[in-house]
Amino acid sequence: MSRLRRTNYQKYLADLAEQYGVEDKIEFLGSLSGEEMKQAFLDANVFVLPSTIENSPNSLGEAMLLGLPCVAAAVGGIPSMLENGREGLLYGDALDDKALADAVLRILQSADGGMALGRAARARALQTHDAARNAGELEQIYKTILQEEQP
């Protein structure tokens, strides 16, 4: 815990955990190296993204690339990244803690522990994060723009 208490926000989170009596159920990891972050993802059973505002969260893409079953609030660009029921589970109101808990339990209690969702998430992420494919699409966009008649 001492490693965590370096910022006001980190202190706020630790105090909140204590207030709700869950400090022994939460592990605050603090800053992680890239390899430590990858291992933390791989050690998880479910990736949860309860954000109220998101565009295209890198953390969701990273979890998908690593094949984690994902639960996320259906806000911003998240539904365009993750198909509900196929590549993970989305819940409607980001502040609905019961819906979030139900989605996590649905994955944990499923026969395969969310493995099928994780495999589908990885397949989609490999396709959408393919550097060569994305570079080719971007090149086509630029060529189209260059071919348009200039005023």
Regions found by a protein language model. Name each.
Residues 31, 39-44, 100:
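Short alpha-helical donor nucleotide-sugar binding micro-motif in glycosyltransferases
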Residues 47-48:
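A short hydrophobic beta-strand element within the catalytic core of glycosyltransferases
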Residues 69-72, 82:
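Short hydrophobic beta-strand element within catalytic cores of glycosyltransferases
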Residues 113-128, 134-140:
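A short, well-ordered alpha-helix in the C-terminal region of glycosyltransferases
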